[in-house]
Swiss-Prot record:
The lineage of its organism: Eukaryota, Viridiplantae, Streptophyta, Embryophyta, Tracheophyta. SUPFAM superfamilies: Cytochrome P450. GO terms for cellular component: endoplasmic reticulum membrane. It is an enzyme of class 1 (oxidoreductase). The chain crosses the membrane at residues 7-24. Keywords: Endoplasmic reticulum, Heme, Iron, Membrane, Metal-binding, Monooxygenase, Oxidoreductase, Transmembrane, Transmembrane helix. It comes from Vicia sativa. Weakly expressed in seedlings. It is a single-pass membrane protein. Induction: By clofibrate; weakly. Its main location: endoplasmic reticulum. This is Cytochrome P450 94A2. Heme binds at residue 455.
Length: 513
């Protein structure tokens, strides 16, 4: 710890000395892009250190800070100067999003910085892959995600988790009038679900005792510390710590070892299980790992990387979306009533066809994710020089970030009522009062990405979320137990979270008829 502190102070002191010296000698020049006007709040930039001072001052609210800048710029695009000459383009313009995600897709990849930051945790999984590796994983994943048998398996997994675990936990909280952290409950629920769907492995995270599970804890630490690497202003610092195996880098190494150790063990056991089933002519398992192995992809490292990426993508995004959804629902009783009308008369285990009919619920989930997207930003790296549709020059190696959070709050996209939680903006209603979903193009609403990298698990995510919403709302009312009038803080790790959790009371609802 003393060595780590010494190294950190040496790097910080050297950086601070040069920053103060250069700041007194040189004033910044605004970047030569269409975003640069004398009235925009683009932060000052200094030689070597760029806009590090502004970045550090706003790091705790960097999502909101960069969103605020984008809202005041006519082009909805600006260039941020990072330390040591690096540049990062931020945009909230649909035409630019379409350009980087579809029109000029081959120019923009994950990049070396992302790969190095995440590789220890995700390996070469689809979430961390580019080029031919990504294409191959995308192809086999798309095939498996679109099978009817997987959809039925997802339905079964979610139904069992709801009836056997979530409902008893909420009933117990209602009877005892205890306060629950609903964000934690949803994270446990979705972790159990996605582990079963991906691995056929039940971590038993959502039990009445709300146990601490080493695998879940290690998974959280691995994702959080990996994203801290990615957000580091001075990447050299974490690389030095990793080399010396000290501080958070030692913690990350231990967490990753726990995750990958158990994952590898599960893969080995699954291969053995599949061989035994084949010998006994038993029906095959339908979880994703079994599907990958049965289709000839037997390399343990490859399938482990793929499945860990799927768990990461499916766990935190779904719980984040549901957390903010239930908070917004508590503030808008008319939306709650419309959803209750929609689920009234449906079976306790809502079937696939019934889920498809939950049009208003679908719109409410989309509207919630517009204001509070599970993934607030997404960043690509330019493979070669490019010019964006608004004229912004992008050099090879520059980061280009499309700001999903800012786009969901853009008056240019959503109109003057953008701040209102209004599911009806996604709907049309016929003369007999039946809702139909209208939607919006992916490039104005890139919550599930767009183009070739559009989320392959989107339909599975909506299936899971709508079944959970119906399962909870048909039995309980979720009542926030936080200070009245204070909005929870939206903050981002790998995905968004409600800072400090979501304390709630659970009230039993009269049976819907």
């Amino acid at each position: 710890m003393e060595l780590e502190t010494l190294i950190s102070w040496l790097l910080f002191s050297t950086s601070l000395f040069w920053f103060l010296f250069l700041a007194t000698k040189t004033k910044s020049k605004p970047p030569k892009t269409p975003s640069s006007t004398t009235n925009t709040p683009i932060p000052k930039s200094y030689p070597i250190f760029g806009s590090a001072f502004s970045l550090l001052a706003n790091f705790h609210r960097r999502i909101q800070w960069t969103s605020d800048i984008l809202q005041t710029i006519p082009s909805s695009t600006f260039v941020l100067h990072r330390p040591f000459g690096a540049r990062q383009v931020f945009t909230a313009q649909p035409a630019v999003v379409q350009h980087i995600l579809r029109t000029n897709f081959t120019c923009y990849g994950k990049g070396l910085t992302f790969y190095q930051s995440i590789n220890d945790f995700l390996g070469d999984g689809i979430f961390n892959a580019d080029g031919e590796s990504w294409k191959f994983q995308r192809q086999i994943s798309s095939h498996e995600f679109n099978t009817r048998s997987l959809r039925k398996f997802v339905e079964t997994v979610v139904d069992v988790e709801l009836s056997d675990r979530l409902v008893p936990v909420l009933s117990q909280a209602s009877n005892s009038q205890t306060t629950l952290d609903f964000q934690d409950i949803l994270q446990r629920l979705t972790f159990d679900n996605i582990c079963m769907i991906a691995f056929g492995y039940d971590p038993e995270y959502l039990l009445p005792s709300l146990p601490e599970i080493p695998f879940a804890k290690a998974f959280d630490e691995s994702s959080q510390l990996s994203i801290e690497r990615l957000n580091a202003l001075i990447p050299l610092l974490w690389k030095v710590k990793r080399f010396l195996n000290i501080g958070v880098e030692r913690q990350l190494k231990e967490a990753v070892a726990e995750v990958r150790g158990l994952a590898t063990k599960i893969v080995k056991n699954k291969k053995k299980e599949l061989k035994e089933k084949a010998l006994q002519s038993e029906s095959e398992s339908v979880d994703l790992l079994s599907r990958f192995l049965s289709s000839g992809h037997s390399d343990e490292s490859f399938v482990t990387d793929m499945v860990i990426s799927i768990i990461l993508a499916g766990r935190d995004t779904t719980s984040a979306a549901l957390t903010w959804f239930f908070w917004l629902l508590s503030k808008h009783s008319h939306v709650e009533n419309e959803i209750l009308k929609e689920i009234t008369g449906k079976s306790e285990t809502v079937g696939y066809d019934e889920v498809k009919d939950m049009v208003y619920t679908h719109a409410a989930l989309c509207e919630s994710m517009r204001l509070y997207p599970p993934l607030p930003v997404d960043t690509k790296v330019a493979v070669h020089d490019d010019v964006l549709p608004d004229g912004t020059l992008v050099k090879k190696g520059w980061r280009v970030t499309y700001h999903i959070y800012a786009m969901g709050r853009s008056e240019k996209i959503w109109g003057p009522d953008w701040a209102e939680f209004r599911p009806e903006r996604w709907l049309s209603r016929d003369e007999v009062g039946k809702w139909s979903f209208v939607g919006i193009d992916y490039y104005s609403y890139p919550v599930f990405q767009a183009g070739p990298r559009v989320c392959i698990g989107k339909e599975m995510a909506f299936l899971q979320m709508k079944r959970v919403v119906a399962g909870i709302m048909g039995r309980f009312r979720v009542v926030p137990a936080m200070v009245e009038g204070i909005e929870p803080e939206y903050t981002a790790h790998f995905t968004s979270v409600m800072k400090g959790g979501f304390p709630v009371k659970i009230e039993k609802r009269s049976p819907l008829v």
